[in-house]
Every structure is written in structure tokens, then in C-alpha cells.
């Protein structure tokens, strides 16, 4: 369940940020900002659902999921194929996420 929350949070964060990107960089209508802000609020809410005793750990673990989701966004939403360094970087970040999520805690 935690992974699904992280994945949904990443989707909402990327979509929200992309709405601002589209408005400022792609000359889209300011109307893009309304759904962008809703997406960013949903992103923040979803991260509060993560089971963690400290917020920073939840955010740190989320970082690797966000990077992978961003690489997928490049490919599927923007139509650009990630290069090998994108993939290597995403895999490295995901390894860090796994360490944070699954390390034994006292």
C-alpha cells in the first residue's frame, strides 16, 4: 500500500509542476494553474498517509520514487526517450529508497 501512495503522490506532484511548466514555458493558459494547484495539494496530502514516525524519512524515501516517475513522465507524457544516464540515475536513487524503506530500525 505504501508504494501505491508514493506512486500516486509522484503522479500528482509531477502533474502539478508540469501545469506550471506548461503555463510559464509552453505559453499555455493560466487556467492550467488551477488543476496544477489541486494536484500539488493532493500530492502533499498523500505524503501524510505514509507510515513513518518522522516526516523527513518519508520524504527521503519518496525522492527515489519521484525520480523514477519523472523519468517515466519524460517518456510517456513528453514523448522523449530517457537516455542511459537517466536510467542509471533513477536506479541509483531507487536503491537509496529501498535502503531507507527496508533498513532495520531500532
Curated annotation (Swiss-Prot):
Disulfide bonds: none annotated. It holds the Pfam family UPF0060. The lineage of its organism: Bacteria, Pseudomonadati, Pseudomonadota, Alphaproteobacteria, Hyphomicrobiales. The keyword Transmembrane helix applies. It comes from Brucella anthropi (strain ATCC 49188 / DSM 6882 / CCUG 24695 / JCM 21032 / LMG 3331 / NBRC 15819 / NCTC 12168 / Alc 37) (Ochrobactrum anthropi). PANTHER family: UPF0060 MEMBRANE PROTEIN YNFA. HAMAP family: UPF0060 (MF_00010). It is found in: Cell inner membrane. Keywords: Cell inner membrane, Cell membrane, Membrane, Transmembrane, Transmembrane helix. The chain crosses the membrane at residues 3-23, 30-50, 60-80, 84-104. It is a multi-pass membrane protein. This is UPF0060 membrane protein Oant_2511.
